[in-house]
């Protein structure tokens, strides 16, 4: 560890493993079980504690806290963890709590994520790569978010909710149920309003894939009959298309919160995207 990269006012506990190229700013606090990879930047007054591993290039900005105990009254100091993947940025005043014994004991954030100011990642959450949480987003414990999801500012996500990859959540939403991959939802309480069509186009999904997803969405959420019957029909008609198969697998997977269904804005959203 290079003393030149650590501000003299920072408090670094004996035992912390800090790469030579990592930097620690003024008045930051780094606990004894923290591991900082190459190029990690820790801003002024940030707090890193517990068994916390930051991969190369992670940035922790001023006053953020990572690895503090979970907000779980059952937690009694067990050795749970936080892992943050390469190049992820945790902005000012954001909080990332370590796992609990009621979960897997791990809070994990993937690579190239952006956790904006004052966002909260609760215990045992899993965020895959390229997830963006805008300002003041609140994730309850045990939330799962797939890759390349955007969550708008001020949104609250209930504990144990799953959000499938490439979904988009509108700002100021209250998300109580699982959101399908590629879905778009908003509102208090949030309801599906269609697909994340803009995101799909920006990320290079072709016309064939988008058309199949739109047909599947209409069949699942705007069709007639029971939901199970609609799932079976979509599987029959479009189940060979990879993204549709992903949605069907998401629906069939175990869920503690249940699946979010479409709201009244769906018809308008789909019409505008046509």
Enumerate the language-model features and the residues they cover:
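Terminal amphipathic alpha-helical/low-complexity segments used for targeting or macromolecular assembly
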Residues: 1-9, 14-15, 20-21, 57, ...
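Structural signal for interior beta-strand "rungs" in well-ordered beta-sheet cores
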Residues: 4-191
């Amino acid at each position: 560890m290079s003393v030149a990269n650590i501000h003299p006012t920072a408090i670094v506990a004996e035992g912390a493993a800090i790469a030579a190229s990592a930097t620690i700013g003024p008045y930051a606090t780094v606990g004894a079980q923290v591991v900082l990879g190459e190029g990690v930047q820790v801003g002024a007054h940030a707090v890193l504690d517990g068994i916390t591993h930051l991969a190369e290039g992670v940035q922790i900005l001023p006053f953020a806290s990572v690895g503090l105990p979970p907000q779980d009254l059952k937690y009694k100091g067990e050795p749970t963890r936080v892992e943050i993947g390469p190049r992820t940025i945790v902005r000012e005043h954001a909080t990332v709590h370590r796992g609990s014994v009621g979960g897997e004991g791990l809070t994990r954030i993937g690579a190239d994520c952006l956790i904006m100011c004052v966002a909260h990642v609760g215990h045992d959450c899993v965020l895959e790569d390229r997830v963006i949480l805008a300002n003041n987003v609140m994730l309850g414990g045990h939330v799962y978010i797939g890759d390349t999801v955007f969550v708008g500012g001020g949104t609250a996500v209930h504990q144990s909710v799953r959000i499938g990859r490439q979904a988009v959540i509108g700002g100021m939403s209250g998300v109580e149920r699982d959101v399908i991959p590629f879905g778009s939802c908003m509102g208090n309480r949030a309801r599906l309003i269609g697909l994340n069509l803009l995101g799909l186009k920006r990320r290079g999904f072709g016309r064939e894939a988008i058309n199949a997803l739109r047909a599947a969405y209409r069949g699942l959420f705007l069709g007639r009959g029971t939901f199970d019957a609609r799932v079976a029909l979509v599987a029959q008609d479009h189940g060979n298309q990879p993204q549709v198969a992903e949605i069907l697998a998401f629906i069939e997977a175990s869920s503690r919160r249940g699946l979010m269904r479409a709201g009244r804005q769906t018809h308008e959203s789909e019409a505008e995207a046509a």
